[in-house]
């Protein structure tokens, strides 16, 4: 009887303790995920088809599952378990205009915030039910590429304004960073890009230790009325005002597509660089908190390689980068995953997966078993596009 009471008391104390440890910030959520889910699974691998959808982003959730944002023609949000089985999904066809789920993040209240491309941000509860949405009402479309929740509960939205700046609208072609309140109200917007150049875009954003933001994107240069993309990393203060900027590129097409932050407040950014008009390489760069390039490398050889997403390993020893590749201009694209040493930028391993039609990977996250889960858009599994989800082990292998 004494022994039973002892364990009963321990159970009560454990319940009280767990009730007092409610995550109150984005970093708390991430720590909770690591603490409670790190023992799940053991190098589980699989390849799974989610029909009728395209997957653009994937994250780990605080209850040891995964959440995918994408498109069925409209935005879709899908919760899956660690084996790729659907738990629930939400679609948002009632929101007017074109929109698709470019990015998703878990919020401090257990819900999700979705960057839904054309002018749209969607906030949901923990099971994907819409709580509110915001349509950005400017003179031209503002394409939302990424959204994060700040440490104080607001949201930062980044992307690019569509259209040709020569058409007479000053905001067209500019990259933008926008701050929203917790309830979705726009507080301010700042736009960047050289005058008379189209399609400057911020593709990814993270919050810095000082409360500012570091952005990854593409910035166009006008040279004798010819436009060239540059790989672009920019730091702003908490109000979106520029503090430093890095541009890397020549007379071709270079883009920074995604970014992760390390614990020392440095950043690893990935995207693509052009070696010639027919040869693209994946590009990866590490940048200090003050904007100094610590290292940068290209990978791909003679292939056409583009990186679209990046995830940092829990121990910060490596990043896994995802994108797509093809061996020649006439061949179909295939998924490609790179493992890159975070200290040197050197390739540790690389894997290619694909069929006989176009397959492009866009989102990647480190899994709970230290493998990686990838989502994208595939046409190799039937006549219609599908979200082809690939779960690898820690070296990028699939059994």
Give residue ranges: language-model regions:
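Sec-dependent signal peptide recognition
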Residues: 3-10
């Amino acid at each position: 009887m004494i022994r039973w009471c002892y364990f009963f008391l321990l159970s009560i104390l454990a319940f009280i303790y767990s009730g007092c440890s409610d995550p109150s910030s984005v970093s708390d959520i991430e720590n909770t995920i690591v603490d409670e889910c790190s023992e799940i699974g053991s190098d589980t691998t699989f390849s799974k088809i989610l029909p009728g959808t395209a997957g653009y982003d994937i994250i780990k959730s605080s209850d040891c599952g995964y959440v995918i944002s994408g498109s069925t023609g409209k935005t879709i949000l899908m919760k899956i378990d660690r084996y790729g089985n659907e738990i629930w999904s939400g679609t948002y066809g009632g929101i007017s205009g074109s929109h698709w789920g470019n990015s998703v993040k878990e919020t401090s209240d257990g819900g999700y915030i979705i960057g839904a491309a054309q002018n749209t941000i969607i906030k949901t509860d923990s099971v994907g039910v819409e709580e509110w949405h915001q349509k950005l009402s400017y003179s031209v479309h503002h394409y939302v590429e990424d959204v994060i929740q700040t440490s104080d509960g607001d949201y930062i939205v980044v992307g690019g304004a569509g259209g040709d700046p020569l058409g007479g609208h000053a905001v067209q072609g500019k990259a933008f960073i926008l701050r929203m309140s917790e309830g979705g109200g726009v507080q301010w917007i700042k736009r960047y890009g050289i005058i008379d150049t189209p399609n400057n875009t911020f593709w990814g954003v993270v919050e810095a230790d000082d409360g500012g933001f570091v952005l990854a994107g593409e910035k166009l240069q006008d040279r004798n009325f010819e436009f060239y993309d540059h790989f672009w990393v920019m730091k702003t203060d908490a109000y979106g005002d520029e503090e430093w900027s890095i541009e890397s590129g020549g007379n071709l097409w270079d883009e920074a597509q995604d970014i992760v932050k390390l614990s020392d407040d440095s950043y690893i950014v990935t995207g693509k660089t052009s070696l010639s008009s027919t040869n693209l390489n994946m590009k990866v760069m590490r940048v200090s908190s003050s904007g100094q390039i610590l290292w940068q490398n290209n990978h791909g050889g003679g292939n056409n390689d583009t990186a679209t997403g990046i995830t940092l390993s829990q121990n910060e020893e490596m990043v896994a980068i995802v994108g797509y590749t093809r061996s020649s201009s006439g061949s179909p694209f295939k998924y490609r995953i790179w493992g890159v040493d975070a200290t040197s930028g050197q390739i540790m391993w690389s894997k290619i997966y694909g069929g006989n039609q176009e397959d492009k990977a866009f989102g990647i996250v480190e899994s709970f078993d230290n493998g990686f889960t990838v989502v994208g858009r595939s046409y190799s599994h039937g006549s219609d596009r599908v979200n082809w989800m690939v779960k690898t082990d820690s070296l990028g292998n699939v059994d």
